[in-house]
């Protein structure tokens, strides 16, 4: 196996690891969003005493949404890298 093939395979393996990590981040983000919603509900039920907590819950929800948007963007970029690696692998196979 040539050095180029090893590099492509290693890069592809790393992209799979990154994809799994992005999935984990998405799962945590979803859980965080649910926790923020539950916290907001409880803050609302607490009335005046829960107003400060409602602000914190809203901020946590916003952070979760921001992380979700970043994760989606990274997924798009990672998919593009995988596509290019697939094309490169096919080109290398044809040139051998």
Residue ranges, per PLM feature:
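Parallel, heptad-repeat alpha-helical coiled-coil signal-transduction segments
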Residues: 9-16, 20-31, 44-87
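Short, low-complexity N-terminal regulatory "tails/caps" that precede and couple sensory modules
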Residues: 1-2, 9
